[in-house]
């Protein structure tokens, strides 16, 4: 169980850390876009679209890592006062009842969304926009998978924490 948890968490963290570099590219593209717009009055649908595509990929690919690092939004009013075992129970049931079903539905629907986009050859509706819209849409099932894998790691860690005698 420990090896599986470690494997899941290392995989999610590596992908999250790699995805975090997308923020640098987003900043560079936005700065270049603003410079071109205000200096030369040149705008591009493709540059605007790549900005939000990269942001979407960053958000989806790093969400599992954010959960691993406990950086997701949480209402800590009660949680912070709980014992380690009570926190483990909350994490276990929260992951089983809320997180994994959400990831499952997001994965299945996102996969169908991506497949349909690929099958119809979906491109940007904007002139000069990006082709192959299925590429960004594929980030949805991938992101849901990563978030779900981290959820499984949390479940395993919670079970271990519950079973350990204080």
Regions found by a protein language model. Name each.
Residues 1-166:
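Alpha-helical transmembrane segments and membrane-interface helix-loop junctions
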């Amino acid at each position: 169980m420990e090896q599986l948890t470690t494997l899941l968490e290392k995989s999610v963290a590596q992908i999250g850390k790699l995805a975090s570099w997308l923020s640098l590219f987003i900043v560079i593209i936005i700065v270049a876009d603003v410079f071109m717009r205000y200096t030369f009055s040149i705008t591009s649908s493709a540059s605007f679209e790549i900005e939000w595509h990269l942001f979407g990929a960053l958000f989806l690919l790093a969400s599992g890592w954010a959960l691993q690092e406990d950086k997701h939004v949480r209402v800590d009013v009660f949680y912070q006062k709980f014992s380690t075992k009570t926190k483990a129970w909350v994490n276990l049931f929260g992951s089983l009842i809320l997180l994994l079903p959400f990831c499952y539905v997001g994965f299945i629907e996102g996969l169908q969304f991506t497949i349909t986009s690929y099958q119809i050859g979906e491109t940007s509706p904007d002139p000069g926009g990006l082709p192959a819209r299925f590429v960004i849409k594929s980030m949805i099932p991938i992101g849901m998978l990563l978030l779900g894998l981290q959820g499984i790691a949390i479940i395993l860690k919670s079970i271990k924490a519950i079973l350990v005698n204080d």
